[in-house]
Amino acid sequence: MELQKQIEQYLLDSLEGDSSMDEDVVERFGERCKDALRKQFNGKKREFTLRMSAIGRPLCQQQMEKEGAKPEPLKPSLKLKFTYGDMIEALVMAVMEAAKVNIESFQEGVSHTTGSTTIKGTLDVIIDGKVYDIKSASQHAFKNKFSRSDGFAKIAEDDAFGYIAQGYLYSSAKDLPFGGWIAYNKETGDIAVCKAPASDAYKRSAIGKANKNIKALVDDVPFKRQFEKVKEKFRNKITGNYTIALNCRYCNFKTSCWGNEIVFRKNPRGASSKWYVGEPK
Protein backbone atom coordinates (compact mmCIF):
# COMPACT_ATOMS: atom_id res chain seq x y z
CA MET A 1 0.00 0.00 0.00
CA GLU A 2 1.26 3.50 -0.83
CA LEU A 3 2.48 5.52 2.13
CA GLN A 4 -0.22 8.20 2.01
CA LYS A 5 -3.01 5.63 1.63
CA GLN A 6 -1.60 3.60 4.52
CA ILE A 7 -1.64 6.66 6.79
CA GLU A 8 -5.12 7.72 5.70
CA GLN A 9 -6.52 4.21 6.10
CA TYR A 10 -5.26 4.04 9.68
CA LEU A 11 -6.84 7.42 10.46
CA LEU A 12 -10.16 6.33 8.93
CA ASP A 13 -10.08 3.07 10.88
CA SER A 14 -9.37 5.04 14.04
CA LEU A 15 -12.37 7.29 13.42
CA GLU A 16 -14.53 4.18 13.10
CA GLY A 17 -13.04 2.66 16.25
CA ASP A 18 -11.45 -0.17 14.28
CA SER A 19 -7.82 0.57 15.12
CA SER A 20 -5.78 1.53 18.16
CA MET A 21 -2.44 3.06 19.13
CA ASP A 22 -0.07 0.91 21.16
CA GLU A 23 1.02 2.28 24.51
CA ASP A 24 4.70 2.28 23.50
CA VAL A 25 3.83 4.56 20.56
CA VAL A 26 1.99 6.89 22.95
CA GLU A 27 5.01 6.95 25.27
CA ARG A 28 7.42 7.75 22.43
CA PHE A 29 5.14 10.58 21.28
CA GLY A 30 5.20 12.02 24.79
CA GLU A 31 8.99 11.83 25.00
CA ARG A 32 9.38 13.50 21.60
CA CYS A 33 7.11 16.33 22.70
CA LYS A 34 9.22 16.77 25.83
CA ASP A 35 12.33 16.85 23.65
CA ALA A 36 10.69 19.54 21.50
CA LEU A 37 10.13 21.75 24.55
CA ARG A 38 13.69 21.21 25.76
CA LYS A 39 15.08 21.99 22.31
CA GLN A 40 13.05 25.16 21.84
CA PHE A 41 13.14 26.59 25.36
CA ASN A 42 16.32 25.22 26.94
CA GLY A 43 18.64 25.14 23.94
CA LYS A 44 21.77 27.23 23.54
CA LYS A 45 21.85 30.41 21.50
CA ARG A 46 22.41 29.38 17.90
CA GLU A 47 25.46 30.72 16.11
CA PHE A 48 26.08 30.53 12.39
CA THR A 49 27.34 27.18 11.17
CA LEU A 50 27.11 25.39 7.84
CA ARG A 51 24.09 23.11 8.18
CA MET A 52 22.61 20.56 5.80
CA SER A 53 19.15 21.90 6.60
CA ALA A 54 20.02 25.42 5.44
CA ILE A 55 22.86 25.17 2.91
CA GLY A 56 20.43 25.09 -0.03
CA ARG A 57 19.03 28.52 0.83
CA PRO A 58 20.15 31.52 -1.25
CA LEU A 59 23.87 32.16 -0.80
CA CYS A 60 23.38 35.88 -0.13
CA GLN A 61 21.08 35.11 2.82
CA GLN A 62 23.67 32.81 4.37
CA GLN A 63 26.43 35.36 3.76
CA MET A 64 24.43 38.00 5.62
CA GLU A 65 23.91 35.64 8.55
CA LYS A 66 27.59 34.68 8.66
CA GLU A 67 28.66 38.34 8.58
CA GLY A 68 26.39 39.13 11.53
CA ALA A 69 24.01 41.42 9.64
CA LYS A 70 21.06 42.76 11.61
CA PRO A 71 18.06 40.45 11.10
CA GLU A 72 14.40 41.41 10.96
CA PRO A 73 12.78 41.95 14.39
CA LEU A 74 11.63 38.66 15.87
CA LYS A 75 7.99 38.03 16.76
CA PRO A 76 7.15 36.19 20.01
CA SER A 77 4.86 33.87 18.04
CA LEU A 78 7.86 32.49 16.16
CA LYS A 79 8.95 30.46 19.19
CA LEU A 80 5.54 28.78 19.42
CA LYS A 81 5.52 28.24 15.66
CA PHE A 82 8.83 26.35 15.83
CA THR A 83 7.67 24.34 18.85
CA TYR A 84 4.40 23.49 17.11
CA GLY A 85 6.35 22.30 14.08
CA ASP A 86 8.43 19.92 16.20
CA MET A 87 5.30 18.57 17.88
CA ILE A 88 3.59 18.06 14.54
CA GLU A 89 6.58 15.98 13.47
CA ALA A 90 6.18 13.89 16.64
CA LEU A 91 2.45 13.46 15.92
CA VAL A 92 3.03 12.37 12.31
CA MET A 93 5.63 9.87 13.50
CA ALA A 94 3.21 8.45 16.09
CA VAL A 95 0.50 8.03 13.45
CA MET A 96 2.91 6.31 11.05
CA GLU A 97 4.15 3.97 13.77
CA ALA A 98 0.58 3.10 14.73
CA ALA A 99 -0.25 2.55 11.04
CA LYS A 100 2.60 0.01 10.89
CA VAL A 101 4.52 2.00 8.30
CA ASN A 102 7.90 0.37 7.66
CA ILE A 103 10.06 2.92 9.50
CA GLU A 104 13.73 1.96 9.32
CA SER A 105 15.29 5.00 11.01
CA PHE A 106 14.20 8.24 12.66
CA GLN A 107 16.14 11.42 13.51
CA GLU A 108 19.47 9.98 12.39
CA GLY A 109 22.61 12.12 12.30
CA VAL A 110 24.31 12.31 8.89
CA SER A 111 27.12 14.28 7.24
CA HIS A 112 28.19 15.54 3.82
CA THR A 113 31.77 16.24 2.74
CA THR A 114 32.96 18.35 -0.17
CA GLY A 115 36.63 19.20 -0.51
CA SER A 116 38.00 19.53 3.01
CA THR A 117 34.70 20.68 4.52
CA THR A 118 32.18 18.46 6.30
CA ILE A 119 28.73 19.66 7.29
CA LYS A 120 26.26 17.80 9.49
CA GLY A 121 22.52 17.37 9.77
CA THR A 122 19.75 15.13 11.04
CA LEU A 123 17.42 13.36 8.64
CA ASP A 124 13.80 12.90 9.67
CA VAL A 125 12.87 9.38 8.67
CA ILE A 126 13.75 6.44 6.41
CA ILE A 127 10.76 4.47 5.12
CA ASP A 128 11.01 1.46 2.80
CA GLY A 129 14.57 2.34 1.86
CA LYS A 130 13.87 6.00 1.06
CA VAL A 131 14.66 9.18 2.99
CA TYR A 132 11.69 11.46 3.71
CA ASP A 133 11.47 14.87 5.34
CA ILE A 134 8.43 15.76 7.48
CA LYS A 135 7.13 19.30 6.95
CA SER A 136 4.37 21.26 8.64
CA ALA A 137 2.83 23.46 5.96
CA SER A 138 0.51 26.43 5.73
CA GLN A 139 -2.75 26.03 3.86
CA HIS A 140 -1.29 27.95 0.91
CA ALA A 141 1.91 25.87 0.70
CA PHE A 142 -0.01 22.62 1.16
CA LYS A 143 -2.60 23.44 -1.50
CA ASN A 144 -0.27 24.96 -4.08
CA LYS A 145 2.78 22.77 -3.59
CA PHE A 146 2.87 19.71 -1.34
CA SER A 147 -0.52 18.19 -2.22
CA ARG A 148 -0.29 18.67 -6.00
CA SER A 149 0.71 15.89 -8.38
CA ASP A 150 3.43 18.25 -9.68
CA GLY A 151 4.27 19.44 -6.18
CA PHE A 152 8.00 18.70 -6.44
CA ALA A 153 8.32 20.81 -9.58
CA LYS A 154 6.38 23.63 -7.90
CA ILE A 155 8.74 23.61 -4.93
CA ALA A 156 11.72 23.57 -7.29
CA GLU A 157 10.46 26.73 -9.04
CA ASP A 158 11.19 28.87 -5.98
CA ASP A 159 12.86 26.82 -3.27
CA ALA A 160 13.45 29.72 -0.87
CA PHE A 161 14.11 27.42 2.09
CA GLY A 162 16.47 24.96 0.39
CA TYR A 163 14.16 21.99 0.90
CA ILE A 164 15.37 20.13 -2.19
CA ALA A 165 19.07 20.38 -1.38
CA GLN A 166 18.29 19.35 2.20
CA GLY A 167 16.46 16.22 1.10
CA TYR A 168 19.06 15.10 -1.42
CA LEU A 169 21.96 15.76 0.95
CA TYR A 170 20.30 13.59 3.60
CA SER A 171 19.56 10.79 1.15
CA SER A 172 23.01 10.97 -0.46
CA ALA A 173 24.62 10.67 2.97
CA LYS A 174 22.81 7.34 3.41
CA ASP A 175 23.29 6.31 -0.24
CA LEU A 176 19.50 6.00 -0.53
CA PRO A 177 16.88 7.62 -2.78
CA PHE A 178 15.12 10.78 -1.61
CA GLY A 179 11.44 9.87 -1.29
CA GLY A 180 10.13 13.42 -0.87
CA TRP A 181 8.15 15.17 1.85
CA ILE A 182 5.45 14.02 4.23
CA ALA A 183 3.52 17.27 4.62
CA TYR A 184 0.98 18.12 7.31
CA ASN A 185 -1.51 20.93 6.72
CA LYS A 186 -1.47 22.95 9.96
CA GLU A 187 -4.94 24.36 9.29
CA THR A 188 -6.92 21.32 8.13
CA GLY A 189 -5.01 18.31 9.47
CA ASP A 190 -4.59 16.82 5.98
CA ILE A 191 -1.47 14.82 5.18
CA ALA A 192 0.10 14.52 1.73
CA VAL A 193 3.16 12.69 0.47
CA CYS A 194 4.91 14.86 -2.10
CA LYS A 195 7.07 12.44 -4.07
CA ALA A 196 10.53 13.20 -5.42
CA PRO A 197 11.15 12.17 -9.05
CA ALA A 198 13.17 9.07 -9.81
CA SER A 199 15.47 11.03 -12.15
CA ASP A 200 18.90 12.03 -10.82
CA ALA A 201 18.80 15.43 -12.55
CA TYR A 202 17.38 17.25 -9.53
CA LYS A 203 19.81 15.43 -7.24
CA ARG A 204 22.87 16.49 -9.24
CA SER A 205 21.64 20.08 -9.43
CA ALA A 206 20.76 20.31 -5.72
CA ILE A 207 24.00 18.81 -4.44
CA GLY A 208 25.99 20.87 -6.93
CA LYS A 209 24.33 24.05 -5.62
CA ALA A 210 24.98 23.00 -2.02
CA ASN A 211 28.65 22.36 -2.76
CA LYS A 212 29.01 25.77 -4.44
CA ASN A 213 27.41 27.46 -1.43
CA ILE A 214 29.70 25.60 0.95
CA LYS A 215 32.81 26.65 -0.99
CA ALA A 216 31.67 30.27 -1.25
CA LEU A 217 30.98 30.49 2.50
CA VAL A 218 34.23 28.78 3.48
CA ASP A 219 36.22 31.00 1.09
CA ASP A 220 34.41 34.17 2.23
CA VAL A 221 33.40 35.11 -1.30
CA PRO A 222 32.30 38.80 -1.33
CA PHE A 223 28.60 39.42 -0.78
CA LYS A 224 26.37 39.95 -3.79
CA ARG A 225 22.59 40.00 -3.70
CA GLN A 226 21.29 37.30 -6.02
CA PHE A 227 17.86 38.78 -6.72
CA GLU A 228 16.68 41.87 -8.59
CA LYS A 229 13.53 43.89 -8.09
CA VAL A 230 10.39 42.48 -9.72
CA LYS A 231 7.74 44.29 -11.76
CA GLU A 232 4.45 44.24 -9.88
CA LYS A 233 1.38 42.90 -11.61
CA PHE A 234 -2.24 43.43 -10.62
CA ARG A 235 -4.85 41.38 -12.47
CA ASN A 236 -2.13 40.44 -14.98
CA LYS A 237 -1.29 44.07 -15.74
CA ILE A 238 1.99 45.86 -15.00
CA THR A 239 1.37 48.54 -12.35
CA GLY A 240 4.60 50.48 -12.71
CA ASN A 241 5.64 49.52 -9.18
CA TYR A 242 8.46 47.20 -8.18
CA THR A 243 8.54 44.66 -5.35
CA ILE A 244 11.31 42.52 -3.93
CA ALA A 245 11.62 38.92 -5.17
CA LEU A 246 9.89 36.04 -3.39
CA ASN A 247 13.19 34.76 -1.98
CA CYS A 248 13.86 38.21 -0.52
CA ARG A 249 10.43 38.30 1.11
CA TYR A 250 11.29 35.17 3.08
CA CYS A 251 14.78 36.41 4.00
CA ASN A 252 15.49 37.52 7.58
CA PHE A 253 17.95 40.15 6.35
CA LYS A 254 15.98 41.98 3.66
CA THR A 255 16.12 45.40 5.31
CA SER A 256 19.84 45.08 6.02
CA CYS A 257 20.37 44.03 2.41
CA TRP A 258 18.09 46.49 0.58
CA GLY A 259 18.35 49.32 3.11
CA ASN A 260 16.32 52.46 2.38
CA GLU A 261 15.47 51.22 -1.10
CA ILE A 262 12.49 49.26 0.21
CA VAL A 263 9.32 50.17 2.11
CA PHE A 264 6.52 48.02 3.55
CA ARG A 265 3.28 49.48 2.28
CA LYS A 266 -0.34 48.56 1.66
CA ASN A 267 -0.98 47.64 -1.95
CA PRO A 268 -2.74 50.70 -3.48
CA ARG A 269 -4.92 48.36 -5.55
CA GLY A 270 -5.62 45.70 -2.94
CA ALA A 271 -6.00 44.95 0.76
CA SER A 272 -2.63 43.30 1.38
CA SER A 273 0.70 44.87 2.28
CA LYS A 274 4.04 44.02 0.72
CA TRP A 275 7.64 45.13 0.37
CA TYR A 276 8.07 47.68 -2.42
CA VAL A 277 11.24 49.00 -4.00
CA GLY A 278 10.46 52.71 -3.72
CA GLU A 279 7.11 54.21 -2.80
CA PRO A 280 4.18 52.52 -4.62
CA LYS A 281 2.05 54.62 -6.94
Stretches with model-predicted labels:
Residues 150-164:
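A short acidic, glycine-rich active-site loop
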Residues 157-159, 169, 173-281:
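Metal-dependent nuclease catalytic regions and adjoining charged, substrate-binding loops involved
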Residues 62-64, 101, 163, 170-172, ...:
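Broad hydrophobic/π-residue packing in well-ordered secondary structure
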Residues 1-131, 136-154:
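Metal-dependent nuclease catalytic cores that hydrolyze phosphodiester bonds in DNA/RNA
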